């Protein structure tokens, strides 16, 4: 659809696109409501279509009324059950959310209408999606500046940009597992330093935030998709291989007897004292030693971001199977995206 709409994607459109990439997280503001949504819903689906609609509406240059209708059309399509985590359908959620947002904006552009109070009305998004959390409505009003007629957190001039709260993920699995994986990768190195190997591990205790087991508590994953939601698998791979890349979530690795053996020796224990981005991992070794690593902020977090070299390594590692010798050219082009006059110069490399 993009290729058909803009055969030549010029710099003016590219600048608009980059702007909405920066702005639409403010419009969607999923993080504000995450703790208030029903525990059975996937936040990416529940909020993503609204953010996508706002972003596309911005690119299309829709009027205020049309944007309101686009948001309404998107809001009525929200979907996503957390029961789907560990299956292909989990990845369907963000794709469907983006599709719904795109469709909503084009429908609004064509004159299709919706309620202009789709978010805040009594039977609107906030009160339906957050039906069991009465504070959702209040937080929405605060975010939009409706509560006391002040400049809301999402308004221009508020000085808050959600893009600055995003970061790049080093590990291809649930973000709540990252502190544990970070600790285990470091412990893998600690073992090597003292001349020991993972087979010297008797038991492992991972102290984690309650959300870790709620979201990633699959003790015996059977597939790579299920393993992405298993703190046990992530920890085992970090300890065994000293890295956790897409390869470690292959079905073969999930069935690897070494991985299963170590996974079975890992005990994840909830600690109310830990924040969601913290973890403590203890290794009890066969010689009586105990190694410990505590993570306050995992690699890839806002506080400890991936550096450019790590990002380059991740890009090359994941894209080489597809782009082969062209991966370096594509990487260089992505780093210099703001200098391109025509986005097709980049897409031609992909």
Q: Model segments located where?
A:
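Conserved phosphate/anionic-ligand binding catalytic regions in large, soluble enzymes, centered on
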Residues: 1, 45-48, 172-176
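Glycine-rich, mobile lid/loop segments that gate access to catalytic sites or pores
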Residues: 4-104, 110, 115-124
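Terminal-appendage/accessory-domain detector
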Residues: 86-100, 106-350
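Active-site catalytic microenvironments for nucleophilic, acid-base chemistry
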Residues: 2-5, 59, 183-186, 190
């Amino acid at each position: 659809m993009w290729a058909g709409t803009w055969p030549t994607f010029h710099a003016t459109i590219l600048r608009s696109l980059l702007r909405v990439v920066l702005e639409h997280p403010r419009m969607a503001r999923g993080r504000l409501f995450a703790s208030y949504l029903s525990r059975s819903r996937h936040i990416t689906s529940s909020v993503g279509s609204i953010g996508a609609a706002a972003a596309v509406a911005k690119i299309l240059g829709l009027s205020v009324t049309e944007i309101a209708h686009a948001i309404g059309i998107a809001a009525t399509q929200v979907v996503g059950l957390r029961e789907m985590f560990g299956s292909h359908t989990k990845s369907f959620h963000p794709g469907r959310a983006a599709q719904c947002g795109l469709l909503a904006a084009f429908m609004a552009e064509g004159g299709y209408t919706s309620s202009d109070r789709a978010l805040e009305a009594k039977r609107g998004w906030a009160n339906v999606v957050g039906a069991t959390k009465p504070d959702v409505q209040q937080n929405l009003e605060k975010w939009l500046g409706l509560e006391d007629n002040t400049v809301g957190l999402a308004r221009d001039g508020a000085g808050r940009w959600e893009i600055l709260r995003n970061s790049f993920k080093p590990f291809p699995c649930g973000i709540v597992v990252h502190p544990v994986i970070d600790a285990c990768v470091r412990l893998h190195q600690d073992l090597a330093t003292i001349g020991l190997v993972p087979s010297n591990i008797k038991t492992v205790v991972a102290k984690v935030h309650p959300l870790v087991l709620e979201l990633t508590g699959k003790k015996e994953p059977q597939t790579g998709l299920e393993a992405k939601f298993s703190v046990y698998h992530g920890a085992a791979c970090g300890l065994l291989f000293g890295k956790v890349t897409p390869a470690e979530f292959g079905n073969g690795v999930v069935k690897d007897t070494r991985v299963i053996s170590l996974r079975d020796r890992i005990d994840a224990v909830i600690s109310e004292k830990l924040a969601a981005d913290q973890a403590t991992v203890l290794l009890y070794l066969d010689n009586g030693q105990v190694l410990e690593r505590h993570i306050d902020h995992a690699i890839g977090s806002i506080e400890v971001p991936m550096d450019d070299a790590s990002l380059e390594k991740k890009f090359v590692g994941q894209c080489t199977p597809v782009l082969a010798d062209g991966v370096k050219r594509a990487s260089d082009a992505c780093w210099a995206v703001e200098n391109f006059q025509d986005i097709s110069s980049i897409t031609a490399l992909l």
